[in-house]
Amino acid sequence: MKDVPAFLQQSQSSGPGQAAVWHRLEELYTKKLWHQLTLEVLDFVQDPCFAQGDGLIKLYENFISEFEHRVNPLSLVEIILHVVRQMTDPNVALTFLEKTREKVKSSDEAVILCKTAIGALKLNIGDLQATKETIEDVEEMLNNLPGVTSVHSRFYDLSSKYYQTIGNHASYYKDALRFLGCVDIKDLPVSEQQERAFTLGLAGLLGEGVFNFGELLMHPVLESLRDTDRQWLIDTLYAFNSGAVDRFQTLKCAWGQQPDLAANEAQLLRKIQLLCLMEMTFTRPANHRQLTFEEIAKSAKITVNKVELLVMKALSVGLVRGSIDEVDKRVHMTWVQPRVLDLQQIKGMKDRLELWCTDVKSMEMLVEHQAQDILT
C-alpha cells in the first residue's frame, strides 16, 4: 500500500511551480471524487514539467496505481500512454501495456487504444510481422464500433506508418487519408501538415490502383504545400486528376527531381493515360460517348496502334465499361468509375446538367406546339 498523502505532500514542496495542482489532486483524492480527479490527471500528465525525466512513472507508481480501478478504462489508457513515453526500454513498456490491456478489457475502445500503442512500439523496434498482426486484430475490432471514435485516428496513424515502412503506397494513401478524416487539421503543426501532404501526394501518384485524387485535392492539408518549393506536387496531382498528359510532361522539370517519381516515370505515364481516358469518358454527354482511336491517341499522347491496348487495360481494371469497334476504330463507353471530383470537374457537371435541362425544355416546347399533329 503506497503512502499517497506523503507522496503528494512531498511533490508539493519539491515542485513549487505546480504546488496548486498537487494540492488539488490531494483534495480530490481525499474526497474520492474520481471523475474530477481523472480529468485533472489527464490534463496534468501533459504538463511541460514532465517533458524530461521519469516524473510520470513515479506519478503512476505512487499515485495513479492506487485508484486506477476507479478510472474510466479509456481515460486510464490515455493517461498510461503518457507514462509509457518515459520508459526507455521498449520491452518494459510492452509488458506494462500488456498488463494495462488486461485491466481495461471491459471497454473495447480502451483495448483498441492499448493494442494500437503496442503495435506502435513494435513498429518502432522493427518487428514488422507483429505489427501487421496487431493491425489486423485491431482493425477487426474497430469495424465493430459504431461510428468514428477517438481511437480511430490513432489506429489509422499506426497503420499508415506501417504501410509507409513496407512501401505499400496504395494502402498508405488510403489509411493516411482516413487519419486526416479523423482529426482536426488545425491541431497538426504546419511542418507535419506539409510532410503528410507531401508523402500522401507521392503515395497517390505511385500507388497501384489509386485513380482517385479528388479527396486529397479537396483536403486543406494539401494547401500547406502551396507557395512552397513543393507547389509542383499540387500541380502534378491536378494534372493526374484531369488526365492532362501534356501538363504532366510539362511539369517533368519539377517532378523529375524527385527520385521515386523519376524512377517510376513509365508507370506514372501509363497511369495518367488511363486517367485521360476516364476523363474523356466522364466529360462526354451520356448519349455521345463514342470515342475515336484518333481522339484518344491525341489526348493520351500515344500512337493510334496503342489505343486498343490502353482501352483494354482500362476495361480490365474496371475503370470504364464499354466495347471496342476495331473495324471503325471507335470505342463506345457506357460507364466510368465514380470518383471524388474537384471543383473544376463539378463545374463541368453543372454545365452539362444545364445543357440537358435546356434540351428537355426545348423538347417540352416542341411537344407543346406540335401536340395536335402528334395526336392526329
Swiss-Prot record:
Disulfide bonds: none annotated. The modification N6-acetyllysine is found at K298. GO terms for biological process: meiosis I. One of its GO terms (cellular component) is proteasome regulatory particle. Residues 171-338 form the PCI domain. Keywords: Acetylation, Proteasome. GO terms for molecular function: endopeptidase activity. InterPro entries: PCI_dom (IPR000717), PSD13_N (IPR054179), PSMD13 (IPR035298), WH_DNA-bd_sf (IPR036390). Coiled coil: none annotated. Belongs to the proteasome subunit S11 family. Component of the 26S proteasome, a multiprotein complex involved in the ATP-dependent degradation of ubiquitinated proteins. This complex plays a key role in the maintenance of protein homeostasis by removing misfolded or damaged proteins, which could impair cellular functions, and by removing proteins whose functions are no longer required. Therefore, the proteasome participates in numerous cellular processes, including cell cycle progression, apoptosis, or DNA damage repair. Component of the 19S proteasome regulatory particle complex. The 26S proteasome consists of a 20S core particle (CP) and two 19S regulatory subunits (RP). The regulatory particle is made of a lid composed of 9 subunits including PSMD13, a base containing 6 ATPases and few additional components. This is 26S proteasome non-ATPase regulatory subunit 13. It comes from Mus musculus (Mouse).
